[in-house]
Amino acid sequence: NNVKYYNDSKATNIDSVIAAINSFESPITLILGGLDKGADFKALRKIVKKKKILIVAYGSAAERISKTLRDAANLYLTDKLKEAIEISYRVTHPGEIVLLSPGCASYDQFLNFEERGIFFKQTVKAFAIA
């Protein structure tokens, strides 16, 4: 669908998320969330607002992400990563980017960040084929 998908599942802290966001110039749909480790999502406010990032928050961190960033970004909330990928697929326009850079642990739905990343890649490929 002329959207580029990036797997940064290893980004389990906010500094890593900010570094990933700063790697791109194109508009970003950011998949953020997972197991809430008490991260300081406020640190994302400035960059999210400046770059007009759309956020799809998922997992146990989704509600806190929403409360912290709702006035800085357009947000979608869901429980599962698969649903977050589906939403991203629907709302991201050609020429834009979907970035999985969760800023949270993976243990709520996956064994580790590697398994989460593999799941992300497989799900994106499944949408591309459909």
At which residue positions do the language-model features occur?
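ATP-dependent carboxylate-amine ligase
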Residues: 2-4, 9-130
